[in-house]
Regions:
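Hard-cation-handling environments
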Residues: 180
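Regulatory cytosolic signal-relay segments
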Residues: 1-28
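A short alpha->loop->secondary-structure connector
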Residues: 122-135, 173
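Catalytic core of PPM/PP2C metal-dependent serine/threonine phosphatase domains
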Residues: 30, 60-128, 140, 144-147
């Protein structure tokens, strides 16, 4: 298991970001990746989970986080980022898929933009209780993205889980990674 924690002050707001990853039993590499980018004003956090486990999943999630981090840092629009990732990931010979989930959190002061692709929806703890948040659904190359804009108060948290094996289901009941995703 690996845990990383980073605290940074952005625009008079303190962001505490912690990541816990755990390798699948018997695997030396983890299929989850997290990229953290900080500057004086903002933070960008990208989480990705590659299809499968071990080396294959690690390659997919590493490519996804690296490409998204680089493109977002260069202010590339999200639709172009998603298209580039989809066209670049190597195809799995067994499953005939090139697939990795991702969640992007971009902060600006006490506000944040949250973009989620095929991960369970993040849990937003607002004022000490699990809060509901709205999201718009956007389709980019048949990929369903959930985009939200959140406001954080002192003590608020955003918890992002990843999918777990083939048993995970999306909020609408479909299996993660089902055809068209």
């Amino acid at each position: 298991m690996m845990m990383r924690k980073r605290t940074n002050r952005c625009r008079n707001t303190v962001w505490d970001i912690s990541v816990i990853s755990r390798n699948k039993n018997g695997e030396t590499l983890c299929g989850d990746q997290c990229a953290l980018e900080w500057d004086d004003n903002d933070a960008t956090v990208i989480l990705s989970d590659g299809l499968g486990s071990g080396v294959k999943a690690n390659i997919l999630s590493t490519l996804t986080t690296t490409m998204l981090t680089t493109m977002l840092k260069g202010n590339v629009p999200i639709d172009e980022c998603v298209t580039t990732v989809a066209e670049t990931l190597p195809m799995c010979k067994e499953r005939k898929l090139a697939y990795a989930t991702f969640t992007i959190l971009q902060t600006a002061g006490t506000r944040a933009r949250l973009i989620q692709y095929d991960n369970p929806n993040a849990v937003f703890v607002h004022n000490g209780a699990i809060g509901k948040y709205n999201y718009s659904v956007n389709f980019i190359q048949e990929k369903e993205l959930h985009e939200s804009y959140l406001h954080f108060d002192v003590g608020d948290m955003l918890l992002q889980r990843r999918r777990v094996g083939g048993r995970a289901r999306r909020d609408d009941g479909r299996r993660l990674g089902a055809a068209g995703h």
